[in-house]
């Protein structure tokens, strides 16, 4: 997250990165399952999206444009916020739980990045259910985490291509 915040800042975007975990230190990569369980049991998608919507209300008048960029759980949270009229766009990387909220129709430009495969669902099936909506979807070589340079699933080529598409999307909208 810090890398993406830094990169976007270097491209002259103001970046706000809220701490949705309500704890000082992040989970270690080896604690991925524990981190996800903590999120689902103690925070949840609805509560997290309400926290982000509240933040959006606080900042919307301070900026010409407001976007949400989310990874994994954050991508699903961005998706849940996509019906807010104060958003100018969302970017979602491997938001696997979007599959639980396919009834949402984003009101803002939306770009989603998925890996070729996920452990818990069929990526092509989710993409197929989302293609009817007016959103941009890209599938990249690799697995969940392909854009995270600290992940064992990191794929440099896919990460760079997704990053370029994200920046182009943000500049376009």
Annotate each PLM feature:
Residues 134-173:
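C-terminal catalytic histidine-bearing segment of alpha/beta-hydrolase fold enzymes
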Residues 60-71:
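Alpha/beta-hydrolase fold nucleophile elbow
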Residues 70-74, 78:
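Gly/Ala-rich beta-loop-alpha elbow adjacent to hydrolase catalytic centers
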Residues 111-114:
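Short beta-strand/loop motif that positions the catalytic acidic residue
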Residues 124-135:
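Conserved loop-alpha-helix segment in the C-terminal half of the alpha/beta-hydrolase fold
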Residues 116-121, 129:
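Acidic catalytic loop of the alpha/beta-hydrolase fold
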Residues 1-61:
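Serine-hydrolase catalytic machinery in alpha/beta-hydrolase-like enzymes
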Residues 86-96:
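A conserved short beta-strand
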